[in-house]
Amino acid sequence: MQSIEDIWQETLQIVKKNMSKPSYDTWMKSTTAHSLEGNTFIISAPNNFVRDWLEKSYTQFIANILQEITGRLFDVRFIDGEQEENFEYTVIKPNPALDEDGIEIGKHMLNPRYVFDTFVIGSGNRFAHAASLAVAEAPAKAYNPLFIYGGVGLGKTHLMHAVGHYVQQHKDNAKVMYLSSEKFTNEFISSIRDNKTEEFRTKYRNVDVLLIDDIQFLAGKEGTQEEFFHTFNTLYDEQKQIIISSDRPPKEIPTLEDRLRSRFEWGLITDITPPDLETRIAILRKKAKADGLDIPNEVMLYIANQIDSNIRELEGALIRVVAYSSLVNKDITAGLAAEALKDIIPSSKSQVITISGIQETVGEYFHVRLEDFKAKKRTKSIAFPRQIAMYLSRELTDASLPKIGDEFGGRDHTTVIHAHEKISQLLKTDQVLKNDLAEIEKNLRKSQNMF
């Protein structure tokens, strides 16, 4: 029996003999076999830049090698890290199903790149990492559920998969299930349509660790929330570990049932914020080392200073620089990096909205001094503009709730939540407020040259 991983490793060995080392290291080294769906061999690339290049340049080349190895003509599909999160991952069973050619099919494994050893720890994710490791070492005994929230590409999925890998390696016969809430919803709807709700429930209520991503997409789906509520209760009562991720804390997920919200708050809630400069440099160094790349320190510093949004874009920028260097056959320097990234740096740097910028713009609009936003004054003429500024800070920046609270005179994160909820409700009926906010955002973008 050949697994898809075995086939892919054999494929890579042939590819390596037919490509220059710089090209191989740039385009192929970080790829992995993702899954086999019917006659389609799915390959995972580290980011969309590499994915697009592979699709354009190497699809037929890879298909020919796969046919040479297996005697079978496959369709080849490439996906990137973000697309991977829409797939279901489960633990491979001891006797996996085989297709007619003896190739392992069906279930998808946890992403092999997402383990604790490859996770770079920094100030913005240290607590989330520690909590995830504690849960991995003692499932259902440390924090249950563990709720991790933060923006796109900051490492939530990485930590969830790392827990899954750790449990697999240290707990014999442990059943680990990873999926997105969208996948849960779609399967639930299909089970109702096909009269297979019992099979659906058996599948998700008989695992040792349930990892469910992007739970915010359950908002507004009453039937799915009902089903997940009972799934949660069953697993919790049987002392099975539940880990949930979201782009926001439970209190901020709209139209989420209170009973689910309260259960999400039973365990530990931790956030992940964008990496600081030191962490971004460390991420680039680790990525370069893992891919066998020799990147000058000044180049990594340049990239880290330019790309401060999330890890996915940071690593994508590094790959872009390396690829550009290979294509133009020039050494990697800070100047070359600037040339390679010129199309993406303007959008990532000039369009950053800051809390201080929001405070200044709202203050000018309502004739409120900046110091009043941070003061303890509660008069309506100050409190209401302050709430608007908090609302905009939550909507237009990646800052965490505690960070926003700090910028408004050290206020508690619950104050920020209250302000956001209040303005959100008023916007549903108050046309004057809608007009005010539209004008404020227009002024804000003008002040930061965002046209």
Curated annotation (Swiss-Prot):
Annotated segments matching region Domain II: 72-108
MF-aspect GO terms: ATP binding; ATP hydrolysis activity; DNA replication origin binding; lipid binding
Residue intervals passing through the bilayer: none
Residues involved in ATP binding: G153, G155, K156, T157
Subcellular location: Cytoplasm
PROSITE patterns listed in its UniProt record: DNAA (PS01008)
Region (Domain IV, binds dsDNA): 326-451
Keywords, alphabetical: ATP-binding, Cytoplasm, DNA replication, DNA-binding, Lipid-binding, Nucleotide-binding
Annotated Gene Ontology cellular component terms: cytoplasm; plasma membrane
Domain characteristics, as noted in the entry: Domain I is involved in oligomerization and binding regulators, domain II is flexibile and of varying length in different bacteria, domain III forms the AAA+ region, while domain IV binds dsDNA.
Protein role: Plays an essential role in the initiation and regulation of chromosomal replication. ATP-DnaA binds to the origin of replication (oriC) to initiate formation of the DNA replication initiation complex once per cell cycle. Binds the DnaA box (a 9 base pair repeat at the origin) and separates the double-stranded (ds)DNA. Forms a right-handed helical filament on oriC DNA; dsDNA binds to the exterior of the filament while single-stranded (ss)DNA is stabiized in the filament's interior.
Protein name: Chromosomal replication initiator protein DnaA
Gene: dnaA
